[in-house]
């Protein structure tokens, strides 16, 4: 997000603009995909033009650069897929797209390189401040810490309210999406929004950095803090509203659908800083859209607050860069041949839809904070993200995971925890019955 939508003067507006400005440099330093494609907010009716003008003025006050209200041929020149009957649009040339998985993994790997230790699939059950430090009770034991940073998403209010005198409330707001095949990839060049409402920015149509088209989301307040299931009603709503601003959207090219949750705080504002009535307990709560765009600025802000409170010094040995996984399909033929001669695993295609090699999958597993599940591999190198959604490559990826992790195939999970994909090996089961 460029930063034109958040209320002027809010922390959300400030950090959105700052984060968006930092993202290109961060993409270079941490080697993740970033594309400055620009965004449009489309006004279909003259009666709504005042709303578009207010959005434009709001963006100017927020410090968003290059904003322009466009019409007619100028609008069609920027994005030919916008409906010809569109009255006007707000053009934000600083709008951009990234892969959320790519950014998250890049940050995690860089953190690991700088000494951060990760403990996954662990739930906090209690928090106590005693002896000048925090005792964090989890379902896997006790952790002692000088400070706690609460970035628990839809659970951030639960942890905050365990310790703070000032309570907060977060509502999980579900958004359902559809993803279109690469074959539809050229349908739009820009991220096309509809005029926003109090629930969000409407159903967008946007390219992804990997060449797909993404359509969504809905905005439904729910009670389930983990409720990421899709629904027929939600997907029908996406389908109905998707082509309001664009014409001829090829929805027959949908290859998957999914849902995510926004951690909506009642005041619709980021809560960042020390929690009231606590010592060294810090919140990053209510981080909903534009949270992804704001992430670099949020990270900087909370690190500065914590450093000041704890009198921390800068790490002189900090490693600021990270090299991502080599993508064979992005190399020239000569470069591919050199790499394959060095490591033959890069000559074996495992995921045909996305042209992902065994070498890339092995790298994803062996790296710091490496993949430990089918989804872990998928989110790092996209094996299983293509047209067949893992129908052909899942078993092969599982075999590579089992080999690299020295684990049984039956222990490989879809996404960690107890999400096992098979109950046992057929040959072993047959032999067991033969001995009865």
What are these regions (language model features)?
Residues 127-216, 220-231, 240, 246-249, ...:
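Flavin-dependent oxidoreductases
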Residues 226, 357-368, 391-409:
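Iron-sulfur (Fe-S) cluster-binding segments and ferredoxin-like electron-carrier domains
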Residues 90-147, 155:
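Helical element adjacent to the flavin cofactor pocket in flavoenzyme catalytic cores
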Residues 1-74, 78, 202-203:
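Dinucleotide-binding Rossmann-like beta1-alpha1 core, especially the glycine-rich loop
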Residues 378-394, 411-435:
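Short Fe-S-cluster ligation motifs
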Residues 7-8, 13-17, 44-51, 90-112, ...:
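Short beta-strand to alpha-helix junction loop
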